[in-house]
């Protein structure tokens, strides 16, 4: 049918504006017909018609979105002709529509179900023409939305013939909505509309994970397992598209607590998580910075941290970006409520504010709070429940593989510039640096570098660098070993000075009893290392005073080669109150729990307990603390050997402490003349002739003297002239009551 010239007019009613139809007089066309409107030779638009009595014959009424789309002005001459659809090729299979609120003043954050929207759309616009780029108004739930047709795919022709789907779908510019057309809604860019349901497009989202990161570039070593656990718990759900997360009813993890000894990489890990993610820069806050001297300001500082996340959640809903807030030393502001003295309760209100912001009445789903502390026991328990800081990750001392990674990272630049000598074996250093934290390993590398640099400084009146030699500067294996020996000692390691003083005279194996003690000690060390059933092994060395119990305990500890060895000795607690003693003992054991293999020597237990026979008197508080610590098993995967020493087995028996030890080993005094002579021979202080004289007096006789006391008597007699030494020694032996005999 040939076209006719008509005039564009304004749509007569608001209701007809929402119909997406062009409105004509019933004298011109019938309702339901489709027309092609030409505004110029190259511009044509297809509309579905409705009739209304108020429209003047010879004119076509268009709504504002239609006039905007077609570029029409009121009164403009247009050419109108009937248009018929080819039902085999132009039925709409799938149509993608961009949607936003029509007016900005009507914006809200309520979720809109796209499945219901799609059903309403098909009902309102069934059998109507749609073109790519077309604009229209859509009414749903008493709200007006502006729509823009983005994409149209024709229905599979096989379905129209009643055959199985062939999978062929063709993109078309113009199509007809039918009852089984599919509509997918896509949120307009920067829109705050919150769409839910399945009838929405999968949004092109930027991946949350930065594509070009790796552990070595991040400078993190030895934390592979911890990092993968954090990723699984905190980020896996954020990698998936929001629609899948929504269908699962899944809520993202909002908080992580990293805890562990100082220098093990908590702050480093949190800092690098921000770089790993394609999120905005994390807000890093030191705990004490939150506190303010003015009333209410501390709480306001907490609110400011969350303000950006709240505003974006209101605007973008589920598509809000991730906001990371990092609290360093979180124990400064999140102590147990009610634990602080004073009437102000500032700390309590700060904790309350933080609790309500992370998981309160208005829930935020676009935040990740990372807290760090080396005192997790101080933190309020409400902060650690699921929904708040629910992922609790211990960042402990690195194992050998971890130390290898850390040393590799810290020597990478030297290796790249050929400043690391070929004789440096990183694997050897990783083995030697047991119980070193990441910070201590970095310090070791720094110390080795300074040792190497020091070689090239001229020793003259002025400090000068020998530039000729400096060109050939290299850090050698010797530099690392020297730094290991002299400069850097691990905080949770073995301080040799600790136990070296106890065995400065060596171990004198004067007889089978000493050998048996050392052999049994070695068995207990092997049991601690190898047994999975007994992670806690404790042994009590008991015997008379001066029999060498402490030296044997220190020797067993040294021979164990455990990475952590500590001696809990009364000489380090002189003047301590009972509470201070308990705290000091608890700290030693807590430090031991942080190491994979640990040995604690509890020396002179009756002195630790302040025991005196007159009264009798002892500290019950220290006794109970020690009993608990002796029986407490170390954490999963950690092993602990406890060696106790006492001269008063009978007292510990009455205090019911003997049962707290796995086993008891008796350390006797020297009891026979033969054992005494063996000890003298091993010590080598007396000449053969002198020893023969002593042998004549003691051989076959009973004696009773501790090895420590024997050493004292020998050293005292050696101060005499050579001809009087033996006589003096025998006299001292008699005076000490070591033998009932009268020596000549």
From Swiss-Prot:
Catalytic activity of the protein: ATP + H2O = ADP + phosphate + H(+)
Enzyme Commission identifier(s): 3.6.4.6
Alphabetized PROSITE patterns for the sequence: AAA
Cellular component annotations (GO), alphabetically ordered: cytosol; Golgi stack; midbody; plasma membrane
Modification Phosphotyrosine occurs at: 259
Sample GO molecular function, one term: syntaxin-1 binding
Binding annotation for Mg(2+): 550
Needed co-factor(s): Mg(2+)
Modified residues (Phosphoserine): 207, 569
A single GO BP: positive regulation of receptor recycling
Protein's name according to its UniProt entry: Vesicle-fusing ATPase
Origin species: Cricetulus griseus
